[in-house]
A protein has these predicted regions:
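Extracellular disulfide-bonded cysteine-rich modules/repeats
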Residues: 138-139
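Short, conserved clusters of charged catalytic residues that mark active-site
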Residues: 23-24, 55, 108, 126
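Conserved functional loop/turn residues at catalytic and ligand-binding sites
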Residues: 133-134, 145
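Flexible, glycine/small-residue-enriched loop-and-beta-strand segment within the central core
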Residues: 44-118, 144-145, 152-155, 159
Length: 161
């Protein structure tokens, strides 16, 4: 990927956190390389923490609602700290992964989603929760770290109802 494209993607990803209409936020995310489905709502303060070139590792499917000040982490490492020298002894010090939010999920305000996590369809993540592992479909997960506290029973609509 050429340098200008990388810079453009970074600018788009950063601009998303400022107050713009939802449609413009979605457009900026798509321009940055994130896969965003239809009818998605992303509130102000959204942050995607990742290195340039990893934006494709975030997938947000159709009809997902993301509350204000949600952070999704795709990459995390100690940057220029001397801790970086420990990565050979402790490989887990650098984290790179994908985040996949399945259709009809709702992420509450201030939630943090860490790398290598899938949020199942029709799941709810409570406000302020820190999601460290997969959340199964039709679940409510809350807390730090987030734990499933309830399974949802959702009736499927038929064409006649």
């Amino acid at each position: 990927m050429n340098i200008l494209r990388k810079i453009f993607r970074r600018i788009c990803r950063t601009a998303v956190k400022f107050v713009f209409p939802n449609g413009f936020r979605i457009l900026l995310l798509r321009w940055s390389g994130v896969k965003v489905g239809k009818d998605v709502a992303i509130n102000e303060g959204f942050t995607m923490a990742c290195d340039i070139g990893y934006e494709e590792n975030l997938v947000i499917e159709d009809r997902v609602a993301i509350g204000p000040n949600v952070t999704i982490v795709i990459t995390s490492h100690p940057n220029n700290s001397h801790l970086r020298n420990l990565k050979d002894r402790y490989p887990s010090i650098e984290v790179f992964g994908k985040v996949h939010i399945k259709h009809d999920a709702w992420i509450g305000a201030g939630a943090i989603i860490l790398p290598n996590v899938t949020i199942g369809e029709f799941s709810i993540i409570g406000a302020g929760s820190v999601v460290t592992k997969d959340v199964p479909p039709y679940s409510i997960a809350v807390g730090v770290p987030a734990r499933v506290v309830k399974k949802l029973k959702i009736e499927k609509k038929t064409e006649n109802t």
